[in-house]
């Protein structure tokens, strides 16, 4: 069955199945239909997230094992709830000690029956797989290696020994293994297994092989057959060799259970129509909802203020497109250099075997691969080697991109390598094994490149309005008009009515309520710039760079309601992560301890200081904007809960929820202490969804409603199936500055009266026809109306 609403719980050793079971009565009363569980299969011990799976055949013991999961499912069913599970088909933990399949592969090499499980280029390593686990070069670490029976130990790591090698001298023993222990820095350029993005601790799994699919999904399918689970969330489908084929096989195996995929859509990109899923996990909806509450003219002015204050070079945070392109080059040539080398080897081998393609030098192929990868505007193309590419696939590698890529070659004839690489990437040069491998690998690398260069680099460099730097977002065009939103929602209702929608997840860089606060700054850029100047003057320790200061002060304002004793300890790690991800002055792999100490000192003295002058200035500013933050928070929540799709609530977000980037947003679930206005709204909307499945479900209709009058652009409204009306105030600060609602009216559908479900006055109703916006929003900046008798 399709859920009416899901509630995401982050399971971890500190919040196992038994703790989730205790929350069931509360969550059932809240109004959701399903619990959405983070991964539950056996993971690396102590894992706080569960995406580092080590055994697909067992439910994680640290969470309570299969018995605990089945008990949770039983308790949920008793309260009318089902379970949706997040699964991870793309990768496993590269931890041999815990991952016994990988252990067998390392012991037996390519001859192991499990060798097909993992995406390893054995030829590139001379028959060995590189394990970049050493703290320094091998020569410096030999003294820390020790043989213990049939096991090789390095500190707390364990590796299997190839049969018959345990008694060899250590240097010879190392040479005889099916793996090579290497310095961790070698992962960047020498790695010969596919990984999750740039994380060598997570090794790619080849679920495109039927036997691997069956082995890795058997337990999940059993839990579905037994009624323990009702639906699935698929993590990172873009990492797979053939996402469409995988989803088709999964749909057949599950009997068509409700399934959504964590597919990040870029710009106006649409989910492939042939995918056998209900839709996405909802980041496309997040971008549209956030954009509704962002002022386009103010965002443009804020960009100017940011440039004046921080003075970033265009390609280091001053211009969005230039920043993305520079970041993409950096990632392609550094963090993903090993992936580029793998593609180059494949392309060179294909060309060497075909006289028509021969004589393209490896350097030219490598250059062509790099230049095309950085020009792909979406995460990846979807292509099957040997089959004609679709129009959408061809649009990922346009003629313009090819022309631009060729400009880096000084000899025009050598630039022909670009044409070869494009044809390989689009599957035009046949469907042989190597061609298929290149096609898949190119798409997988494109996905990793986009994620690392945009989400994990450019989002931390281009920071005029950090509420816009969110997963699936477009900081270059952060605002969304009512017309654009209605167009999106209408398309979802028509094409993907059971898709997921979200505002906050375990991966969002800031919770929805933090982003809502920060987005208000797009309505008062001049006031914000003045405040930053005051804060800068009042802080006794200078920021090590002005871009960091801009981000830090926006973050501090976004968390203004956070308890004073928590602010610093939560803000500092988030900002240190931001500067490391940005990679402008320090990074995860090339850290600058002095710079990072300066960041910590600045945060402690200013943005993270729980009292004093700066805290007072931010509190005063926040108090002045509080009514407009309220409108943003309630408006976004109500739109999310009533628009087409299946809303997913992240744990705690039914009430005010302030969280920063992980791990801050992955703390154990805690029931809100005191119900607030947002929780009342949430429970009312969820109860309505549960009561009226035909109104909000897959057969439900969506109709934009029209407002007229001088303030009409500040009112967004829509009707669901002729029975429920949502109306929200947008950009309320600009509205107030413009004189309020005045003559603005909303045209309600005929067939009233319409009862205000959020009103403190029982029986507050409106007849059909026009209603004055000032009257509609007299009690609060949002309204949820139900046609009496529906």
Where are these regions (language model features)?
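Hydrophobic or amphipathic alpha-helical targeting/insertion segments
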Residues: 72-120
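DnaQ-like (DEDDh/DEDDy) 3′-5′ exonuclease domain used for proofreading
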Residues: 119-186
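Carbohydrate-interacting/catalytic domains
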Residues: 1-45, 53, 57-62, 70, ...
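Conserved short loop/turn motifs at secondary-structure junctions
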Residues: 90, 234-240, 557
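Short glycine-biased active-site loop of nucleotidyltransferases that positions the nucleotide triphosphate
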Residues: 45-49, 94-95
């Amino acid at each position: 069955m399709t859920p009416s609403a899901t509630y995401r719980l982050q399971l971890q050793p500190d919040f196992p199945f038994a703790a989730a079971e205790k929350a069931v009565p509360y969550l059932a009363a809240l109004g959701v239909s399903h619990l959405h569980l983070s991964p539950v299969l056996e993971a690396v011990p102590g894992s706080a997230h569960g995406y580092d799976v080590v055994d697909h055949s067992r439910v994680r013991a640290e969470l309570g094992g299969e018995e605990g999961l089945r008990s949770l499912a039983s308790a949920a069913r008793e309260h009318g709830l089902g379970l949706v599970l997040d699964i991870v088909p793309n990768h496993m933990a590269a931890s041999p000690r815990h991952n016994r399949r990988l252990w067998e592969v390392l012991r037996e090499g390519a001859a192991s029956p499990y060798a097909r499980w993992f995406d390893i280029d054995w030829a590139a390593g001379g028959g060995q797989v590189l394990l970049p686990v050493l703290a320094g070069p091998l020569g410096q670490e030999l003294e820390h290696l020790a043989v213990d029976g049939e096991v090789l130990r390095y500190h707390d790591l364990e590796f299997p020994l190839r049969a018959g090698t345990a008694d060899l001298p250590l240097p010879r023993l190392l040479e005889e293994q099916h793996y090579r222990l290497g310095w961790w820095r070698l992962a960047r350029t020498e790695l010969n297994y596919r990984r999750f993005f740039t994380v060598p601790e997570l090794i790619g799994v080849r679920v495109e092989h039927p036997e691997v699919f069956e082995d890795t999904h058997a337990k999940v399918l059993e839990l579905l057959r037994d009624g323990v689970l009702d639906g699935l969330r698929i993590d990172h489908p873009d990492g797979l060799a053939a996402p469409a084929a995988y989803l088709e096989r999964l749909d057949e195996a599950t009997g068509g259970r409700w399934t959504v995929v964590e597919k990040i859509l870029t710009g106006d990109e649409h989910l492939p129509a042939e995918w056998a899923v209900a839709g996405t996990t909802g980041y496309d909806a997040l971008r549209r909802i956030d954009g509704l509450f962002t002022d386009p003219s103010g965002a443009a002015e804020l960009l100017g203020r940011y440039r004046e204050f921080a003075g970033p070079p265009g390609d280091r945070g001053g211009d969005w497109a230039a920043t993305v392109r520079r970041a993409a080059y950096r990632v392609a040539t550094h963090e993903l250099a090993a992936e580029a080398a793998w593609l180059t080897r494949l392309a060179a081998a294909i060309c060497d075997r075909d006289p028509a393609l021969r004589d393209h030098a490896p350097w030219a192929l490598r250059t062509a691969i790099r230049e095309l990868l950085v020009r792909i505007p979406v995460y990846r193309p979807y292509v099957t080697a040997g089959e004609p590419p679709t129009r959408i696939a061809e649009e990922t590698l346009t003629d313009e991109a090819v022309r631009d890529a060729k400009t880096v070659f000084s000899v025009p004839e050598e630039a022909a390598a670009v044409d070869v690489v494009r044809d390989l990437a689009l599957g035009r040069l046949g469907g042989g094994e190597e061609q298929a491998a290149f096609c898949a690998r190119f798409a997988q690398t494109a996905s990793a490149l986009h994620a690392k260069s945009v989400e994990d680099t450019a989002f931390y460099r281009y920071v005029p309005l950090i509420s816009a730097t969110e997963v699936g977002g477009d900081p270059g065009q952060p605002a969304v008009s009512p017309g654009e939103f209605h167009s999106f929602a209408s398309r979802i209702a028509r094409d993907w009515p059971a898709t997921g929608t979200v505002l906050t997840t375990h991966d969002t860089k800031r919770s929805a309520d933090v982003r809502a606060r920060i987005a208000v700054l797009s309505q008062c850029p001049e006031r914000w710039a003045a405040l930053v100047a005051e804060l800068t003057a009042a802080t006794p320790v200078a920021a090590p760079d002005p871009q960091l200061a801009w981000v830090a002060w926006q973050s501090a304002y976004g968390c203004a309601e956070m308890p004073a004793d928590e602010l610093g300890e939560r803000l500092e790690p988030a900002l240190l992560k931001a500067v490391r991800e940005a990679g402008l002055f320090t990074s995860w792999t090339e850290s600058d301890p002095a710079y990072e100490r300066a960041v910590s000192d600045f945060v402690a003295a200013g943005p993270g200081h729980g009292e004093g002058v700066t805290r007072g200035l931010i509190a005063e500013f926040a108090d002045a904007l509080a009514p407009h933050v309220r409108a943003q928070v309630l408006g976004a929540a109500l739109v999310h809960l009533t628009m087409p799709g299946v809303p997913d609530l992240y744990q705690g977000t039914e009430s005010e929820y302030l969280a920063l980037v992980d791990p801050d947003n992955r703390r154990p679930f805690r029931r809100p202490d005191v119900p607030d206005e947002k929780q009342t709204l949430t429970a009312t909307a969820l109860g309505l969804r549960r009561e009226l499945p035909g109104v909000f479900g897959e057969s439900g209709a969506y109709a934009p409603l029209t407002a007229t009058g001088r303030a009409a652009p500040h009112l967004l409204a829509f009707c669901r199936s002729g029975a429920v009306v949502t109306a929200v105030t947008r950009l309320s600060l600009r509205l107030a500055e413009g004189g309020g609602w005045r003559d603005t009216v909303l045209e309600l559908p005929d067939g009233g009266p319409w009862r205000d479900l959020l009103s403190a006055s029982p029986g507050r109703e409106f007849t059909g026809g026009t209603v004055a916006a000032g009257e509609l929003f007299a009690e609060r900046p949002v309204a949820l109306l139900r046609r009496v008798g529906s």
